[in-house]
Amino acid sequence: MATVNYNDGLLVRLQSPEYAIEYLNEALNEGSQEVFMMALRDVAKAKGISQIAKETNLNRESMYRMLSEKGNPNLSSLHQILNSLGLTLAIEKKENAA
């Protein structure tokens, strides 16, 4: 029986938009920029960094830097990346907020 590397399996699962959305939302809920950037990088890898760079007109090397744990993309770049992934940012009221 063939075994699948965890990272390879994750990249396959992240090709599902529903799974990718849940994955990114969980990373956001962690409250850590590093965790979110790692998750966004995983989702981007599932689509292909080169493909996203081509669609967004962002330099591939810059994409890797932006999507690193210490990456700090500006809002415009983040929007372009998410748009290329078929996703968008949304602001919602917290359930327990007054």
List each language-model region with its residue ranges.
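N-terminal flexible/basic segments that precede or flank functional cores
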Residues: M1-A39
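The DNA-recognition helices of helix-turn-helix-type DNA-binding domains
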Residues: K70-G71
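Generic structural marker for isolated residues within well-ordered, non-membrane alpha-helices
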Residues: L40, I49, L78
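DNA major-groove recognition helix of helix-turn-helix/homeodomain DNA-binding modules
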Residues: N74-E92
